[in-house]
C-alpha cells in the first residue's frame, strides 16, 4: 500500500501504481488436467471491452484488506460467496499496459495479489454483474494458454500470470 488514495479513473488516467486482486477459478478435467473459468468483459467496460479475462478481478479499495477485496469481487462479479480460506494465494503479479479506448488513453500499472479458487462452480448458478461481465465459459487450461499466446482469442490475460497459475496447478496436482 502506498498510502495515496486515488479514484480508479484517476489511477488509470495517470498510470499510478495500484493494488488489485486476481482470482482464477479452476476445475479438474480429463483433457489437460484443468479448465479455467473465463469471463467475457462487458462491451461497456472502460478497458478491453468484449475481451476474455481471468475469472474475476478488481481494485483493492482504500482501507480494505486484500483478501476481503478478493472475496468481495467474486461476490460482486459472479455471485460466488467464497470463504477466505477457500482462496489459495499464489503470489503477486506486476502488470502494466497502455492503450486507447473510446478516444482516451488508459494506463494500467498494478500489483495484483493472485488467488486460485477450486471449489465447485456451476455456470448456470452464477449471478453475473452485467456492468462488468457479459458472459462466462469454461475452457481447457492448455487450449486457453495457447490462444492467449497466439492471440487467437481477444483477451487481456497476462501470459506470465498464466504461467504462475500453471506452476501452482502442477504443484497441487501431485496429490490428485
Explain the meaning of each model-derived region:
Residues 1-3, 90-93:
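Local beta-strand/beta-hairpin segments that build beta-sheet-rich folds
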Residues 1-31:
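Acidic, metal-coordinating catalytic segment for phosphate/diphosphate chemistry
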Residues 1-5, 31-40, 124-128:
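Short, well-ordered strand-loop elements centered on a beta-strand within folded domains, enriched
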Residues 7-8, 42, 66:
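Residue-level structural signal for beta-strand termini and adjacent loop
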Residues 20-59:
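A glycine-rich, hydrophobic loop/mini-helix early in the fold
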Residues 38, 55-90:
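The catalytic Nudix box helix
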Residues 50-52, 56, 91-102, 106-176:
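Nudix hydrolase/Nudix homology domain
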Amino acid at each position: 500500500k502506498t498510502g495515496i488514495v486515488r479514484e480508479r479513473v484517476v489511477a488509470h488516467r495517470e498510470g499510478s501504481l495500484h493494488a488489485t486482486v486476481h482470482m482464477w477459478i479452476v476445475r479438474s478435467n480429463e483433457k489437460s488436467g484443468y479448465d479455467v473459468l473465463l469471463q467475457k468483459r462487458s462491451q461497456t467496460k472502460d478497458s478491453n471491452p468484449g475481451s476474455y479475462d481471468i475469472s474475476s478481478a478488481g481494485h483493492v479499495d482504500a482501507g480494505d484488506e486484500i483478501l476481503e477485496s478478493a472475496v468481495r469481487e467474486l461476490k460482486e462479479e459472479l455471485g460466488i460467496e467464497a470463504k477466505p480460506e477457500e482462496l489459495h494465494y499464489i503470489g503477486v503479479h506486476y502488470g502494466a499496459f497502455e492503450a486507447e479506448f473510446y478516444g482516451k488513453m488508459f494506463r494500467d500499472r498494478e500489483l495484483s495479489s493472485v488467488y486460485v479458487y477450486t471449489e465447485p462452480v456451476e455456470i448456470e448458478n452464477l449471478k453475473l454483474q452485467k456492468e462488468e461481465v457479459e458472459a462466462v465459459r469454461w475452457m481447457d487450461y492448455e487450449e486457453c494458454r495457447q490462444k492467449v499466446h497466439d492471440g487467437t482469442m481477444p483477451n487481456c490475460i497476462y501470459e506470465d500470470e498464466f504461467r504462475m497459475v500453471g506452476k501452482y496447478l502442477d504443484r497441487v496436482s501431485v496429490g490428485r
